Each structure stands twice: as C-alpha cells, then as structure tokens.
C-alpha cells in the first residue's frame, strides 16, 4: 500500500503536544510492508538543519498573489521515513497554527501529488489538514482519511465550493473514512451534531494512539536526556540517576525523586538548560517554589500544556486543601495559557517547600518528572487519547486521572474498594468519574491511602493472597511497587506501537476508505 500522510508537525523537528509524537511514530510503524511518505511544511526553517535535496519548485496562488515554494526531499532523523517539505521563507515564519499556512498547504499538496503515481490513500490529521483532504478527494479523486486528534479545535471558517464551514468540518465531509484517537472518545463525540451531519454514515471509529516503547524505555533514561539536550547536558553530573527496569523500579525511582527534587539537583540542571541552544521545540524553564521532604514523602507530578482542558481550575481549587490534610508534594512541568501560568506561579510561591512549578517546555525534564514522581495527575475535563499517561506508565509511574476518553481506555484502575477486591497486581492507576474538586481529591487520596498511608491495613488482605506484609511504600511486595511493574508491562504489551493492534487498525481504516471511495455506490 502506498500511503501519503499529511503532518502538521513532527517530533523532533517542530513539535507541539502529542500530535508531533504521533506524526513521528505512526509513519515509522506503518512503513513495515508499505510505502510511506510524509508531507509537511518547513516551519521556522527547521528542516534546513537536516540533509536535504531541493527537488523542484511549486508556485501556488493565494488571494491573487503567486507564492513559490521549494520542495525539499529528506528523511526523518530518527525513523528514516521519507519527508517531502514545502518551504517558502515568508510562509515558514508564520505561526505553526496560522490558518493561512493550511490554506496554502492544501494547494501545495494537490499540486505535488498530482504528479505522484499509484497513491492508495491520503491520511490527514486534525483541522489543519481538513482543506487538503477535501481537495485530495474532490480534485485528485484519491481515497482519504481524516484523524481527529482533538475535536475541540476546529480551525477557522472557510468557504469551499459555495459552502462555509470550519477546516475540521470540511475534512470530515470529504474524507472517505474518519477516526478519532480512542474508542471511548469516539463514543463521546459521534453524536455531536456537526460530526453526525458531515459523517453522513461514513465509517467512524476510535483507534488508540500509542508510544514507541524504545523511546520511553527507563533503561535508556540517561541516553534520552542527553539526546534531548543535544548532548550538552549529562544528567549524571547533577544528581543521582540510573537506568532501571520494571523489576527494580521500586529501588531506583525513590532515589531519583529524593536526589533531584528533595535535594535540589533539578535547580542546577534547569540553570544550565536555560544556557544551551534548545531549538524551536523547547523553551527556557522558570522555577517557582520548591519541594523538600524525605524519601517516603509522596511526590505527585503533572506534565502537560497549561490549558483549561487539563483540569487546572480543579487543581487550583483542590490542592491547597490536599496540602492542609496530607504531607505531600507537587511538581508541575507546564507551559501555555498565561493566566494559568501566573496562578500556578503564585500557588507554588505561596506553598514553597511543597509545590515546585517548572514553567517551560523541556523533554528531558518531562522524563525526569515521570521517573521521579510517585504518581502523575491528569484531571482532564476531556482527553481524546492522551500520551502523557502512557509515557508516565512506561517510566513505571501510575496515573490519577479522569475517567474520560483515552484515559479510560488506557489506565487499569485500582478498585474503589481494595479490601474486597484487591487488584494491586493489575492496576496502573486511579480513575475518578467527575473532574471537580471532590472527584479529584478522592482520586488523590485513594491513590495515597493504598500506596503510602494504609500499609498496616493492607497487610490484612495482602497476607490472604500470600504476599509478605510490606512495611514501607517501596518494599518489593508493596502495592506501589506492584503497580509500578504493572505500568511498564501494560504499556509494553498493550499500548506500544510495537505490540498494540493500532497499526493493524489503521491499515483497516485505510482499506475501508479505499472501498468507500471506489466501490460504494
């Protein structure tokens, strides 16, 4: 099968959020047995940092003006997938999400693909590709699919063939098959009026995103942190860190937590991080507040964008009360909405010693937060799929999350009543139903009760199932240690691109699009 993928952003060249990671990984794993090429734009001239061949020029007309693009051929630096990159200096420097870019991108795509033979399917991703998908189907008569990574972002209104609709609606209307990124999210949105209207009984399903387990292998954490700092910062120079497996995570993770966060190794690292050239996909990091404690003081981490979707209003309401009731610490690594950033800075400064706010975008630091945290929180109001929970679990860190979308599909929840239904040997996190203060506080307290605070009570039924009674949170047989192991193996077996059924399902989606396009009456 010859597959063309339209990619708004791609990790590590230009990446914002999880979409860039999927655009790196999906082509990599689809290319086994298929011919795959990715079409993208030269955002901020970043592709000039790669070896490339300038193969031709394409001129398109936008609002009466002729704009000429160089067409660059290169390969992805880590996956080897073929990339076709459209480059014009003026357009390159527009914001990554500027709709003008994607109006022009649509014409670039159809002009380029018009000379490419034997294309089986064109796969577009999110609103940015909606117009391109419409034109590939309508003008080039090619089978097309559209993957909705976050339906909350629909793009600007645009006119096409006398109809006015958003970029996303246009893509849904013209695509031969449509999917979103988890089965539960597909169920949540399938009856939204605009989706129902434009789907018009076409195939619609949810296919889970995955992660490349080789990228998030805790045995490679030092190598990963070095690579992600352009080999300018070696984490071993700042604090204790060691590769670890699922089997020894209960020994290594608490030492990373204590050394980097409670003893302060992270502060010197951030100071040096802010001095190096990081490229367009990373930023300097501001430090506000701080955390201290002993090795058994629970540390709860957050990694993600500072947006309303991620549940910040709930966290701002609940965390002060949680700090009053419990001896716990929080570390945040986030960047985004300025108002959220300011509220978080103020919260951290008010609770210095108990909250550390790292304001910025840094992939090495995200690995560190995953590895050093006892739990990761994701109180999202909605979550189409989510990659953070998979990345956290790959680092053997259980997740406290809202029971929604992809979080529901990827986290195996600790039973609400472990006395009667102890499932510590299977659970990878805690799910709560309502993402408000009460729900979130229940989730955090349920997690901490059964992994830190109630070890004596746990012994009553842990002995029943023939485990030695744990005395400390990180004993080999403790609930937390068991859940750490569960997390890694769950990701490896069920959520990695290598082993999950998602690649097979994408091939099925493409086959359905081809059938719909050519064979449906």
Swiss-Prot record:
The keyword Transferase applies. It holds the Pfam family Glycos_transf_1. The keyword Acetylation does not apply. Pathway: Glycan biosynthesis; glycogen biosynthesis. Its EC number is 2.4.1.21. Keywords: Glycogen biosynthesis, Glycosyltransferase, Transferase. Coiled coil: none annotated. GO terms for biological process: glycogen biosynthetic process. It catalyses: [(1->4)-alpha-D-glucosyl](n) + ADP-alpha-D-glucose = [(1->4)-alpha-D-glucosyl](n+1) + ADP + H(+). It is an enzyme of class 2 (transferase). One of its GO terms (molecular function) is alpha-1,4-glucan glucosyltransferase (UDP-glucose donor) activity. Synthesizes alpha-1,4-glucan chains using ADP-glucose. Belongs to the glycosyltransferase 1 family. Bacterial/plant glycogen synthase subfamily. This is Probable glycogen synthase. It comes from Methanocaldococcus jannaschii (strain ATCC 43067 / DSM 2661 / JAL-1 / JCM 10045 / NBRC 100440).
